[in-house]
Each structure stands twice: as C-alpha cells, then as structure tokens.
Curated annotation (Swiss-Prot):
NCBIfam families: serS. Pathway: Aminoacyl-tRNA biosynthesis; selenocysteinyl-tRNA(Sec) biosynthesis; L-seryl-tRNA(Sec) from L-serine and tRNA(Sec): step 1/1. This is Serine--tRNA ligase. One of its GO terms (molecular function) is serine-tRNA ligase activity. It is found in: Cytoplasm. One of its GO terms (cellular component) is cytoplasm. L-serine binds at residues 235-237, 289, 389. Consists of two distinct domains, a catalytic core and a N-terminal extension that is involved in tRNA binding. Catalyzes the attachment of serine to tRNA(Ser). Is also able to aminoacylate tRNA(Sec) with serine, to form the misacylated tRNA L-seryl-tRNA(Sec), which will be further converted into selenocysteinyl-tRNA(Sec). The gene is serS. The keyword Aminoacyl-tRNA synthetase applies.
Length: 430
C-alpha cells in the first residue's frame, strides 16, 4: 500500500507510474482517492471544531445547572443539534475511509528508477550475461515428461485421477530427487548465507493475503476453504512475511532473513502460452523461498544478495540460466523492482522462469503494519520487505532432467545432490 502523503504530494508521479505499468484504468481511482482525501481532511477539521464547541458548551450547561442561575434548555437544544451534525460527519468519515482504503489496497507499488519502461515481457532486459555449463547432449533429446514417464519417476496420469490436471506425483527416485533438491537449497541458504529456516503453515487467513498484497486484487487465483475462511498459500512469502504482521521491531534485529520450504497452490496454473505439458503448467509445486526484512536504506543491497543466493544454487547444480530485469509493464503490482531468473530447457529450446526476486520497499509493510524503531526515542518507521524464490523445483527439475539425461535414457545426479540422494544415476531399470 502506498503512503497517502506521497499520493497527495506527487499525484503526477503516480499517474506516470500507472501508465508505465500499463494500468491507465486506475487513474480515475487515484483522482477519486485524492478528492475523498480532501473531503475527509475538511470533515475531520469541522468535526473536531464541533466537538470542541460541544465540550465548551457542555461545561457551560453544567455550570448553569450547578449554580441554578438560569435555564440551560436553549444550550441543550443547540448541543443536540451539534451532536446530530457530529454523528452525520462521523458516518461520512467512516464511509470515506473505507472507500479510500479499498482504493489504496488496489493501487500498485511505485517503481524504482532503475526499472526499464516497457509494455510487456518482450521488453524485459537481460541482466548481465547468460550463464552456461557444458553438458554432452549430442544425441536425440527427450523432454522432462518423456524422461519422467520412461523412467517411472513422474506420474501425471494418476495425479490427475486423484486431484485433476496440474497435480504431479513424484515416484521412487523421482521423489527422492525432488526431496534432495529441497534439502540442498535449504541447507545452502541457511548454512552459507545466514538465513533462519522456518516451516510455515500452508493455509493462511485473509489478513495474511492482504498483508502481502494478494488480497483483494488476486483473490480469484488462490484456493479458498470458505467454511473456515482459510486459503491455500500461493507461495511461502505469504505466511513468512506475515510472521511479523503488526509488530514493532528493534533496529538491532534487522535484517531478518528467513528461508522456508512450502508446497505452493495456484488456481491459475501460470500463463505459458500454449505449453501445458508436464511441469510447465501445474496447480501445485514445491518451492524454497527467501524472505528478508530490512531498514529502508539497506533493501536494494539485500535484493542483490537474494538474487546472488538464488544464482548460487544454479551455479552449484551447473544449470544454464539467465537473469531478466523486469520492465514496468511486466513487473508484479506489489514489487518496486524485480529480477526473474530463467533456466534453459534444451528439449523445449527456451528459457523457463524458476525464480523471481523482488523488493517491495514499504508496500507490504504498510499493509501488514510491520515497523521498526531505530532507538528508544525515534518515531517508528516501516521496514522494507523482500523475497526471492530459491528456487521453485518444478521448472528447475525440467532443466535438471533434460541437461543431465544420458544417451541411454537415464538421468545423472548433479554432484552436489549425491549426498542427499544416495545414488548417482537414475537408470531406465530404476
């Protein structure tokens, strides 16, 4: 959520941001918000003046009654009229504040100056040079789905029977390889980069979705259990960020860095064009998430750190990848700046998104009321929140399986995963 003071003082900047985000339809909402804000401020002043008058006159009425020096009936009638006016003003103020909050929750975050202006994903910028590793693939390649079926380690058909399309089943060494990836990533983030591991709930309440920005704008994309008013998480970002919702943190505790594994659930299984095969379009997938809470002045260095920590996983696995700096027309509504990390699929001959690393500045913290105090006398400030996928295993598994496949139809296990799997290869007879 944006600061109303920013909107009030710099409306033209916000209008430009909305157009750069390809959201010009939100400009009337901004105008409405500013009009309601002006009316609210005027009403607050008038209401305060009437309440002050009522207090003064109430004292006069009490003095008249105490002294018995005359009748207070006229003043009492006047104050009844004032009370009615105050009640009407307070009712209007409540309506204005509700409307303003709805608009504030719907408006997207401001953009960092380094975010390139562009209309769509086609205008995202490649950040740095793509990273490549040599894998001997001079034979007829199978895609991840063909490998999974032939090796008996993935079962999409039975997953569909149990739950519907988009719910994969990992079998045998495929399940072990998936678990190895998760444990390797968690160990890397906690042991090498200082993250504290948390294992969060996979269901959250509406206040948590509101705090991280999925509610109300993206409410239709999450699975909902209406009888309990709980929602399956689309990402561990939601429960982990909300661990500190409503808290006032001490400056000595910052930065706070968490790493969390969770299953992720999304009703809309991504927008991947016509590609719907295998892991490229799923409703449930596994992901290790990195979440940070920082002081405002430290957040952009923290973003680079998160990106580097995600890249370190791919380098250790020797998976080819590239980094994109998302343009204004493709970045999520909540983020001020975002990097996407894409892994290369040799069978599909294209890059696949496996990680997003974002700085939300104080956008989420303002919604979730997460603040810190620099010292005992200073005014509380909002922290900056960040997160990054470290990484999503579904797309990562696609690239891993395809790059490490053998001419015989097996899959070699990356060196760093062997201590976790207990085997070095998945063979056709596995």
């Amino acid at each position: 959520m944006l600061d109303i003071t920013l909107l009030r003082d710099s409306p033209d900047e916000i209008v430009t941001m909305l157009h750069n985000r390809q959201q010009p339809e939100d400009e009337p909402k901004l105008r409405q918000l500013l009009e309601e804000d002006a009316e609210r401020r005027k009403l607050v002043q008038e209401s305060d003046e009437l309440k002050s008058l009522r207090n003064r006159k109430s004292k006069e009425i009490a003095e008249i009654k105490k002294s018995g020096s005359g009748s207070a009936d006229a003043l009492i009638l006047e104050m009844q009229s004032v009370g009615t006016a105050i009640a009407e003003m307070d009712s209007r103020l409540t309506a204005l504040e509700t409307s303003m909050e709805d608009i504030l929750l719907a408006l997207p975050n401001r953009l960092h100056p380094s975010v390139p202006v562009g209309r769509s994903a086609e205008e995202n910028e490649v950040f740095g040079e793509p990273v490549s590793f040599t894998h001997p693939l001079d034979f007829s390649l199978k895609n991840h789905l063909e490998l999974g079926k032939s090796l008996g380690i993935l079962d999409f058909e039975r997953g569909a029977k149990v739950s519907g399309a988009g719910f994969p089943v990992y079998v045998g060494k495929g399940a072990r390889l998936e678990r190895a990836l998760i444990n390797f990533m968690l160990d890397s983030h906690t042991e090498k980069h200082g993250y504290k591991e948390v294992f969060p709930p996979f269901m959250v309440n509406r206040e948590s979705l509101r705090g991280t920005g999925q509610w109300p704008k993206f409410a239709g994309e999450v699975y909902h259990a209406p009888e309990d008013e709980l929602y399956l998480i689309p990402t561990a970002e939601v429960p982990v960020t909300n661990l500190h919702r409503g808290e006032l943190l001490e400056t000595e505790s910052l930065p706070i860095s968490y790493a969390a594994y969770s299953a992720c659930f999304r009703r809309e299984a991504g927008s991947y064009g016509k590609e719907t095969r295998g892991f490229l379009r799923v409703h449930q997938f596994n992901k290790v998430e990195m979440v940070k809470f920082t002081k405002p002045e430290d957040s952009y260095q923290a973003l680079e750190d998160i990106r580097g920590h995600a890249e370190a996983i791919l380098r250790a696995l020797e998976i080819p990848y590239r980094v994109l700096l998302l343009c204004s027309g493709d970045i999520s509504a909540n983020a001020a700046k975002c990097y996407d990390i894409e892994v290369w699929s040799p069978a599909e001959e294209k890059y696949l998104e496996a990680s997003s690393c974002s700085n939300f500045e104080d956008y989420q913290a303002r919604r979730a009321n997460i603040r810190f105090r620099r010292d005992g006398k200073s005014k509380p400030e909002f922290v900056h929140t960040l997160n990054g996928s470290g990484l999503a295993t579904s797309r990562l598994m696609v690239s891993l399986m395809e790059h490490y496949q053998t001419p015989e139809g097996g899959i070699l296990v990356p060196e760093v995963l062997k201590p976790y799997t207990g085997f070095s290869e998945i063979t056709p007879s596995a």
